[in-house]
Amino acid sequence: NKYGLKDKIQDGVILHCFDWKLSDIQAELPNIAKAGFTAVQTSPLHQKENAGSIWYMVYQPHDFIIGNGLGDEAALRSLCKEAHKYGVKIIVDVVANHTNGSLKNVSARLQDESLYHDYKGYCNDADRYSVTHGRIGMWDLKTEDPRVQKILSAYIQSLKACGVDGIRWDAIKHVGLPSENDSFIDNVVDQDMYNYGEILNTPGSSNPDKLFKEYTQYMSITDNTYGNDVTQAFAAGGTSKLKGNLVFRGIKGNKLVYWGESHDTYSNSGRDAWSKYVDQQFIDRSYAIMAGNNDATTLYY
């Protein structure tokens, strides 16, 4: 393509169009391509309960069917078709680990409690079982259940049919691996698409590097600690607390996704929203380092 964009998403950089309407993304495609972004990541597009503009409600699925306030199936098809003219790929954020905090706020087919794990505790990063079976404020889908897999697989294939090139798997560390007798990743993740999963800090076990490596057999993963550390080091004026990236722990660079800040570090509340108070120049410097890493891709928020 005339913009010099990469053929593979992992080889380029990604623009996170967080909570943008699909029509607005489409209107900005000329500028996005000129800026050098190989891919655009949308917010989740599944149905959600009517909760106004609260950003995190799109991370609490009502049903796994395309269409919410950001756009419907027709808008997604239009976006993908137009994006491909510029050489821009489309990634859609998908929430597969959980639904809502109340089953009253999900569709009838998702109100069956047998579709969810019956572990009553919350997740604890020191306990892997609780990470994959516990709740993070929402009902935790039984991802090893063929019924759940069928629903999610159909949703992924509907996105693919619209022209979507890749999937960002929200909270993937909370979804069990094949070695843990959960066949979700084997049966639902489409390896003909680009896939990367959100793993914040640790997958939660006494041997996290083993789990990191297993996830990367199926998809790229986020290395949030590295990006956050670099940004905070610039802001603090020193690098004494830098620990290095996951490459130093045996994870291949072509399986990593970096950022200088994320929608969570900016939009969350309290201490979790630290990056909104960091001067943009420091975030920009962090992004320069992230994007300069060989093999890894970088998500620009």
Where are these regions (language model features)?
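Active-site-proximal helices and loops of the catalytic beta/alpha 8
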Residues: 1-13, 27-33, 37, 44-61, ...
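Aromatic- and acidic-residue-enriched carbohydrate-binding clefts of CAZyme catalytic domains
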Residues: 8-12, 48-81, 109-142
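Alpha-helix N-cap and loop-to-helix initiation/capping positions
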Residues: 71, 147, 277-278
